Swiss-Prot record:
One of its GO terms (biological process) is coenzyme A biosynthetic process. It is found in: Cytoplasm. HAMAP family: Pantothen_kinase_1. This is Pantothenate kinase. NCBIfam families: panK_bact. Keywords: ATP-binding, Coenzyme A biosynthesis, Cytoplasm, Kinase, Nucleotide-binding, Transferase. Its main location: cytoplasm. It catalyses: (R)-pantothenate + ATP = (R)-4'-phosphopantothenate + ADP + H(+). The lineage of its organism: Bacteria, Bacillati, Actinomycetota, Actinomycetes, Mycobacteriales.
Length: 310
């Protein structure tokens, strides 16, 4: 554990230091399960799960228990009966496009669901709260898709508020990466989860009004050098030509036939016009708000972590 020369609300770890905090937490994922959770281009293996994610799962498990004691104390103060069900613990996972936050969220969901005290763990991405393409076009912000203003932030806030308030069922819209739009009539519903993970680009943003980040009990920022993220984005774009882009119904099907050189230029254009500006202007400035920062090296491996202790 790194010692700070100046007073700081953070404590920093290298991977060797962090892995000792796993204690006796068992590894409950198999290689086959991990393959199903791993995103395109991700290199995560069982060793990283054991050394990075198991200590994290243990920390969150301890914080879930502590948060429930806090809610019980507040109920006692108010003279209220303690609720039969625990208040859902909400985790935010933020980071750039192509940094691997979706894989982080899925692995965390799988690990946390193995703990007997919180077996119901739901994962929702903020993609479902993007405005439909027709609405983005009407507002003249289709080119700003992924920027904060392209999301229905009120709907997202209402969704998380209702989940945390104990509503029996709360439903979110579903986004398709094939059609590049909200799927009409399709919903993803959660039913009183013990833990809710909310994953998205801008989930840690703040503002003058109540924001979804104000409802998080724990938050994670997946970090890396901008140059590395750009490289991963281009690599993923090239790989998608043979998967999602190959579907004739895909919004980006016209990219499927590009040569490597053409696809690289197209990916760099999208990165420089949209993803990099969004990262620099909106996403990266929210990093200090995270409870935990996971820092990736150029090979995708997590080797440094920064935990907010205050």
């Amino acid at each position: 554990m790194a010692r700070m020369s100046e007073p700081s609300p953070y404590v920093e770890f290298d991977r060797k230091q962090w892995r000792t905090l796993r204690k006796s937490t068992p590894l409950v994922l198999t290689e086959e399960e991990l393959i199903g959770l791993r995103g395109l281009g991700e290199q995560i293996d069982l060793e990283e799960v054991a050394e990075v994610y198991l200590p994290l799962a243990r920390l969150i498990h301890l914080q879930v228990a502590a948060r429930q004691r806090l809610f019980a104390a507040t109920a006692t103060f108010l003279g209220e009966k303690h609720p039969d069900r625990q208040v859902p613990f909400v985790i935010g996972v933020a980071g750039s496009v192509a940094v691997g936050k979706s894989t982080t969220a899925r692995v965390l969901q799988a690990l946390l669901a193995r703990w007997e005290h919180h077996p119901r763990v739901d994962l929702v991405t903020t993609d479902g709260f993007l405005y439909p393409t027709a609405e983005l076009t009407r507002r003249g912000i289709m080119h700003r898709k992924g920027f904060p203003e392209s999301y229905d932030r009120r709907k997202l806030l209402r969704f998380v508020t209702e989940v945390k308030s104990g509503a029996e069922e709360v439903c979110a819209p579903v986004y398709s990466h094939i059609s590049y739009d909200i799927v009409p009539g399709k919903l993803h519903c959660v039913r009183q989860p013990d833990i809710l993970i909310v994953e998205g680009l801008n989930v840690l943003q703040t503002g003058p009004r109540l924001m979804v980040s104000d409802l998080f009990d724990f938050s994670i920022y997946v970090d890396a050098r901008i140059e590395d993220i750009e490289k991963w984005y281009v690599q993923r774009f090239l790989a998608l030509r043979k998967t999602a882009f190959a579907d004739p119904d895909a919004h980006f099907h016209h990219y499927a036939s590009l040569t490597d050189e053409q696809a690289t230029l197209a990916a760099q254009e999208i990165w420089n016009s949209t993803n990099r500006p969004n990262l620099v202007e909106n996403i990266l400035p929210t990093r200090p708000r995270a409870t935990l920062v996971l820092r990736k090296d150029a090979d995708h491996s997590i080797n440094r972590l920064r935990l907010r202790k205050l």
